[in-house]
Amino acid sequence: EVTLLIAAYNEQEVVAEKMANCRALDYPAGKLRVTWITDGSTDRTVELLAAYPEVTVLHDPRRGGKTAALNRALGIVRTPLVVFTDANTMLNPEAVAQVVRCFEDPAVGCVAGEKRVAGTGNTGAAATEGVYWKYESKLKELDHRLYSAVGAAGELFAVRRELWQTLREDTLLDDFVCSMLIAAQGYRIAYCKEAYALESPSADMGE
């Protein structure tokens, strides 16, 4: 069994799209547990999620930040593998299956998926962001071929739950730190380009 963990703060605008995306994932029925952690949310995110009986919602009205929410969720989740994704990013249908396949290698403790930027044009912030993530993905792929990728992006990555280490609540790059803590335990970070998360581009260079 696998948990798909979605950390969300006031994401009511994307709940329907994200849940349609979750339901489109090509993974055996009953083997994927979709869990949202919505700590601190004050909009209709929790209310809207109530319409999806297959979803587990973890909610605390107190807002402690994303890192605190992830720490709390990992204290509750019990599946051997946990796949992390953001509420505003959409996964390709094969993403979870491809990520899970990487864990067939017992030396792999973390899997980094690929981040793609949707609808990037030839100019402006969208184009620049798209080029950056293509470059970042290529570096991860090359590192993986040599031995182990370095770091993972929060839009799509996965870990063996038993290797998770509680993060300091002032951690800024939780995805990177989490993956590197697993690498420090002697495990490899695999890169899986067949699993990708699609995200809308930033509106401007400031974002």
Task: Label the model's feature ranges.
Residues V2-T3, R33, V177:
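Cell-envelope/extracellular polymer assembly enzymes that use nucleotide-activated donors
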Residues E13-E17, S41-A51, E94:
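Acidic helix N-cap motif at the loop->helix transition within catalytic regions
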Residues A20-K31:
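Short, acidic, metal-binding catalytic loop of nucleotide-sugar glycosyltransferases
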Residues D60-V77, K134, G151, V177:
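Glycine-rich, basic loop-to-helix element that forms the pyrophosphate-binding segment
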Residues V82:
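Short aromatic/hydrophobic "clamp" motif used to bind/position activated sugar donors
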